[in-house]
Amino acid sequence: MESLSQHTPMMQQYWKLKREHPDQLMFYRMGDFYELFYEDAKKAAKLLDITLTARGQSAGKSIPMAGIPFHSVEGYLAKLVKLGESVAICEQIGDPATTKGPVERQVVRIITPGTVSDEALLDERRDNLLAAVVGDERLFGLAILDITSGRFNVQEIQGWENLLAELERLNPAELLYPDDWPAGLPLEKRRGAHRRAPWDFDFDSAYKSLCQQFATQDLKGFGCDGLGLAIGAAGCLLAYARETQRTALPHLRGLRHERLDDTVILAGASRRNLELDVNLSGGRDNTLQSVIDRCQTAMGSRLLGRWLNRPLRDRAVLEARQDTVACLLQDYRFESLQPQLKEIGDVERILARIGLRNARPRDLARLRDALAALPQLQTALSPLEAPHLQALAGNIRTYPELAELLRRAIIDNPPAVIRDGGVLKQGYDAELDELLSLSENAGQFLMDLEAREKARTGLPNLKVGYNRIHGYYIELPRVQAEQAPADYIRRQTLKGAERFITPELKAFEDKALSAKSRALAREKALYEELLEILIAQLAPLQETATALAELDVLANLAERALNLDFNRPRFVEEPCLRIRQGRHPVVEQVLDTPFVANDLELDDNTRMLIITGPNMGGKSTYMRQTALIVLLAHIGSFVPAQSCELSLVDRIFTRIGSSDDLAGGRSTFMVEMSETANILHNASERSLVLMDEVGRGTSTFDGLSLAWAAAEHLAGLRAWTLFATHYFELTVLAESQPVVANVHLSATEHNERIVFLHHVLPGPASQSYGLAVAQLAGVPGPVISRAREHLARLEATSLPHEAPLREAGKPQPPIQSDLFASLPHPLMEELARLKPDDLSPRQALELLYSWKTRL
């Protein structure tokens, strides 16, 4: 671009700052507006639907501009962050009254999708994460930072597949990776993914920086020894957070090493298919979290979301949670705790904003109310005997001195920002009170002074006044001016009057004229002092917030167990999964009719169920409810079943539903096969596998062959498997595979209409009811009638599929004919009509040659 010397002084200042932040939209403060210039203005006008103008000139060209009022900036920032944009906030830090030329300006903070902390820019019930990754194709170091809570986690992950699955689980708002990685990588498609210089991931500088941040000699205490790649990623995150926040980060107090082998692994497809926190339409209604989340605090809801997306395999922790839920259910103890927890609010994020020194007055008011509620909450916890509850109670400390300080300092309902003052209580600081009194009571002082001076001088026409040029004055008519006392100092002569000032009035003037600005400066300084006092107590306060969030989740699980009729599952060492009267926790909430509960029994002798039955019969619901019951058990929750006994699982896989991956260029069948391949490669005998309609995306024989082979493979792995299929040929697997059993969803026909009974019964289904379901769906009658004709012909003429030999005395498994299978070859029809006894040998030979030619 042109030399800066060609620009006006103000635009020179702008370009110097903009060159330091080329990738961010710059909000450049000018009076009561944030202005955007040039390409930033054009982009913002389009994204925010604001007016683009061109005013003035610089370097001989008009300047494209767009402006935003400073008092309504939060709404615009929220929209930009949601769109994945980053913004540099440039404020006036100089005094316009004393500055020659452009007022000094400085970028005071950078707002990016992964580092926002303002309440207005965040979803209060969802984590907002910043991630960094470094490594090669074999091993990756991944670091995750939640700047709004201070959680800072690291892990090392084997292979691209596991890395991408973990990123899908975490769903970070921003992802940083080295600039020297090749183009076209899968993670480049993620929102908020952008490159950083390779040296930002350097291990040595990262290690030093992290030790400095945590005030430690090394990182051994965090269990991070040997995690070179993860430490490099963590160092990059710390540097990025410092760069964007422009302040110390005292709420980042340590690292936590996460291990995949501590958790039940859920593939991305499994998380989507089970609709844990997002439904298949992308919304949040009718998800597992929408049903089981009645947490009283936003931080509790966020913790519950993390539990659902990262179930545990630690039996001791899970049983401690179960004991806590059981304890809170006794005598309905949770009912007294939940209203108290509601008074606590989102302390976790408030403390983070205090650490970042951008806490608002209302944050401190909420913290004041939370601290005031803690003693009563602690009293309520003290008699509860569950060991885990006692451990939580030990971390929920009271802070009487801080509570009293905030009670004395902050008014009951403070304004949103400190900018205009009016936050601190009268009586908190004598100097502030005096300044405010001067500012607010100047008129009364002048009236009192006028009355006193009239009485002292005996001059009834004396007036006390003020003008902007000469300030405060005492005015006397010219005829009385000679009678002015000796301490009156002449200030101004008018046509018919003289104006004076006294030492007392001069002293008042000096105070009053600067009182408002001095009061505001004093109040801001006192507010900063309050933040520093709170920052000094940040570590114990954060421990308390963590304990409060977990208490909220456990009290919520107790409430849900009572009101949704959930019961305690029992973990056992014996490999098994036994569910009595299990229910789907989401479906039962939206049904107008009672949900039909069903049993499930898998053990070391029965590892796989082949599930048959009509469409809409409930196969998918039965499979999903099993997975959700297992998942809820692995977060320490009670489950929607009369009883449940299970061993720990290592993974939950689902191959359910079908959809194209248009962005990835994959067909429905390709997506299905990719998910199937992932399951077949990674499932173990401790995995739960749900397979629904495998093979339906291709031709009948290809699909059947693939489904059959996949089922045999899973049976060989001895994974806990629910295999729903319309290929009735698969029901014979139970005869050749001892660990396989058949069940079906019951249905019946009444007056040529299908009635779904939804009961799971032993054995294969007797028929598919496909045409009855089509009729129920509204397929026209003539089409149904024609389909019946085709079905009868296909059943009469199609060759049966080969299957393993049956044992003597066992019934023939039912054959499901596929409405969309290929029609039989014409030769098959001729062969069916042929009467061999009517043919001579010569005719038979000619016919054989004819058929051979036509094949």
UniProtKB/Swiss-Prot annotation:
This protein is involved in the repair of mismatches in DNA. It is possible that it carries out the mismatch recognition step. This protein has a weak ATPase activity. Belongs to the DNA mismatch repair MutS family. One of its GO terms (cellular component) is cytosol. Pfam families: MutS_I (PF01624), MutS_II (PF05188), MutS_III (PF05192), MutS_IV (PF05190), MutS_V (PF00488). Transmembrane segments: none annotated. Gene3D superfamilies: 1.10.1420.10, 6.10.140.430, DNA repair protein MutS, domain I, MutS, connector domain, P-loop containing nucleotide triphosphate hydrolases. CDD domains: ABC_MutS1. One of its GO terms (biological process) is mismatch repair. ATP binds at residues 613-620. PROSITE patterns: DNA_MISMATCH_REPAIR_2. This is DNA mismatch repair protein MutS. It comes from the Bacteria. It comes from Azotobacter vinelandii. Keywords: ATP-binding, DNA damage, DNA repair, DNA-binding, Nucleotide-binding. InterPro entries: DNA_mismatch_repair_MutS (IPR005748), DNA_mismatch_repair_MutS-lik_N (IPR007695), DNA_mismatch_repair_MutS/MSH (IPR017261), DNA_mismatch_repair_MutS_C (IPR000432), DNA_mismatch_repair_MutS_clamp (IPR007861), DNA_mismatch_repair_MutS_core (IPR007696), DNA_mismatch_repair_MutS_N (IPR016151), DNA_mismatch_repair_MutS_sf (IPR036187). GO terms for molecular function: ATP binding; ATP-dependent DNA damage sensor activity; damaged DNA binding; mismatched DNA binding.
